[in-house]
Amino acid sequence: MSDDFLWFEGIAFPNMGFRSETLRKVRDEFVIKDEDVIILTYPKSGTNWLIEILCLIHSNGDPKWIQSVPIWERSPWVETEMGYKLLSEEEGPRLFSSHLPIQLFPKSFFSSKAKVIYLMRNPRDVFVSGYFFWNSVKFVKKPKSWQQYFEWFCQGNVIYGSWFDHIHGWMPMREKKNFLLLSYEELKQDTRRTVEKICQFLGKTLEPEELNLILKNSSFQSMKENKMSNFSLLSVDFVEEKAQLLRKGISGDWKNHLTVAQAEAFDKLFQEKMTDLPRELFPWE
């Protein structure tokens, strides 16, 4: 088990699969192409679900690709050692993912036409999902208790830093033509309409039966049964034995876990931190 994080520019990262020098290269040297499509999220916000949907949009609903290539190769995380190497060698348009805050994201993006889809989620659910996820993997420092992780999360002393800072950093981009802001909650509530919105953003036309295939093959149950998407291929060096990295895939699970005192403290913190952003941005409020 790892007993500390890798720190880079004040942000915590796992100390397995990441290096400071690579993080610097990603920010300063990595070249984003105009044809690239990028999935941006804070961890535990529905990243893998969105990857699955985008892969299926690319294949018009045909599941062969998602059933034959691991999810981390179909849409590599650019900031990881493996992802940086894969993407640096890949020719043509690329699909890739990132959890990076805006100040560490590749500088080349801001003068490109590459399309970004930013998926956000109720931070209470992000917190709960993160607690179970980080306790299931071996490459990060683990909290001693639920309360300790709650304090870490509220302070931003967690992997990829503060949720509040991440949102604040990226939200000014939401009016740009090449930036699509989505929420996990709207994707869950009306998956069909949200997938149609993604297709419109990407300039992709689908037949009704292709859209139906995308919805079917990206369902939580389908992903849980697909060994290329459920992370069961990861070695025991990375995950605890019998860990389920796709846990529930629901909205509002925080109500089953947060104490009344924690919920009240979190509400107060949310109001303080997000007061300068329009409430309608957050469909869970």
Swiss-Prot record:
List the InterPro entries. P-loop_NTPase, Sulfotransferase_dom
* EC main group: transferase
UniProt main location, coarse: cytoplasm
Q: Recorded E.C. number(s)?
A: 2.8.2.2, 2.8.2.14
| Top-level taxonomic group | Eukaryota
Q: Give the modified residues of type Phosphoserine.
A: S251
One Gene Ontology term from the biological process aspect of the record? cholesterol metabolic process
Cite the record's tissue specificity text.
Answer: Predominanly expressed in liver. Detected also in adrenal gland and in jejunum.
Q: Which SUPFAM superfamilies match?
A: P-loop containing nucleoside triphosphate hydrolases
Q: Pfam families attached here? A: Sulfotransfer_1
User: Would I find Cell cycle among this entry's keywords?
Assistant: no
Under PANTHER family, the record lists: SULFOTRANSFERASE SULT
Q: Which family does it belong to?
A: Belongs to the sulfotransferase 1 family.
Task: Report the function annotation for this chain.
Answer: Sulfotransferase that utilizes 3'-phospho-5'-adenylyl sulfate (PAPS) as sulfonate donor to catalyze the sulfonation of steroids and bile acids in the liver and adrenal glands. Mediates the sulfation of a wide range of steroids and sterols, including pregnenolone, androsterone, DHEA, bile acids, cholesterol and as well many xenobiotics that contain alcohol and phenol functional groups. Sulfonation increases the water solubility of most compounds, and therefore their renal excretion, but it can also result in bioactivation to form active metabolites.
Q: What is this protein called?
A: Sulfotransferase 2A1
Species of origin reads Macaca fascicularis (Crab-eating macaque)
Q: Which gene encodes it?
A: SULT2A1
